């Protein structure tokens, strides 16, 4: 069976290719060039070619910059303009890594594709990785259900510390074991504000209101804030921390309140991505990557869903991905918070 492995030049994808070879698969590697961040690709491509030579596999460089720009980068920028808090990795996984790359894999005659993500597939569903500290099931929950039968996650049942230790024992790829892990959005050089400043004037002072509509302070520009943020704005006479509750992009205003005013017991989603055949789900939801799962009831509604929480959630942010899990840590569905 022929498998295409997405190679990044990092230890996880490189070891994934090695494990697949050892399991008897015919492996081909591919590095995706997604953006023009200065100095980003040259070193990665060198490492990918070195890994390919060591493993004896064919490697390809696939330029997907135009598609990435249209499907990930531009929506990211425009989301902030609309006062939303985007999740570019969720869009990238759906449209690029498990979209455009899979199409390329098929042109090479591949039967399946693999990545170095920490996640598992169980009974046709994405499942949380064994290494909970590295689990990436949340970011994978927006991919098309139709592609799941064609995906392999070689690291799903492994632990990062063991992967790095194993790589460190292999002279040809030992350098990958000690390199710094990437944790930021790949195309962001410093902060997301630096990206937005290339397209907009984000420094636009405006007013801060409380939940009653009263003007209580000033802010530096609505794009500089996300739901739940507690710094960077003034609140006259405040003795307790205040948090951003709402962003009004059209008026360049933010609404703030005390921590208990952040709480929500319900929300709705768009782009409901259902991995089951059920229109109602009693499950658990994560409203952010590292948030604690909350018991909930989900009801499909047109292309979205309504979500009723059994416990309150703080900081439900429009544009973020809500991911729904069953009691066995498997992804049942996802949707973008409205």
Swiss-Prot record:
Binding site for ATP: 6-13, 32, 116
Disulfide-bonded cysteines: 92-186
EC number: 2.8.1.13
Compartments, record wording: Cytoplasm
GO MF annotation list: ATP binding; tRNA binding; tRNA-uridine 2-sulfurtransferase activity
Task performed by this protein: Catalyzes the 2-thiolation of uridine at the wobble position (U34) of tRNA, leading to the formation of s(2)U34.
Record protein name field: tRNA-specific 2-thiouridylase MnmA
Organism whose genome encodes this protein: Campylobacter fetus subsp. fetus (strain 82-40)
């Amino acid at each position: 069976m022929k498998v295409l492995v997405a190679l990044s030049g990092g230890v996880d994808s490189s070891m994934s290719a090695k494990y697949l070879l050892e399991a008897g698969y015919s492996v081909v590697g591919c590095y995706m060039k997604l953006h023009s961040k200065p100095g980003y690709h040259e070193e990665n491509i060198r490492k990918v070619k070195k890994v390919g030579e060591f493993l004896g596999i064919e490697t390809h460089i696939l330029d997907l910059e135009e598609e990435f720009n249209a499907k990930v980068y531009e929506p990211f920028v425009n989301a902030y303009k609309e006062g939303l808090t985007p999740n570019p990795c969720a869009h990238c996984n759906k449209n690029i890594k498990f979209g455009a790359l899979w199409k390329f894999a098929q042109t090479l005659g591949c039967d399946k594709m693999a990545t170095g993500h920490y996640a598992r597939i169980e009974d046709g569903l994405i499942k949380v990785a064994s290494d909970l500290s590295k689990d990436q099931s949340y970011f994978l929950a927006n991919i098309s259900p139709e592609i799941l039968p064609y995906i392999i996650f070689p690291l799903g049942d492994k632990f990062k510390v063991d992967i790095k230790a194993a790589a460190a024992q292999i002279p040809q790829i030992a350098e990958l074991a000690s390199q710094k892990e990437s944790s930021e959005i790949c195309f962001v050089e410093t902060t997301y504000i630096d990206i937005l400043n290339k397209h907009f004037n984000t420094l636009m002072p405006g007013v801060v209101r409380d939940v009653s509509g009263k003007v209580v302070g000033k802010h530096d520009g609505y794009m500089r804030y996300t739901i739940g943020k507690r710094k960077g704005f003034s609140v006259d006479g405040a003795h307790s921390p205040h948090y951003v509750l709402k962003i009004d992009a059209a008026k360049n205003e933010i609404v703030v309140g005390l921590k208990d005013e952040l709480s929500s017991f319900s929300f709705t989603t768009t782009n409901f991505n259902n991995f089951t055949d059920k229109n109602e789900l009693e499950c658990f939801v994560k409203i952010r990557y590292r948030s604690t799962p909350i018991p909930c009831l989900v009801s499909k509604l047109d292309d979205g869903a309504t979500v009723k929480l059994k416990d309150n959630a703080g900081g439900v942010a429009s544009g973020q991905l809500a991911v729904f899990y069953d009691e066995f840590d498997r992804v049942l569905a996802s949707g973008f918070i409205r």
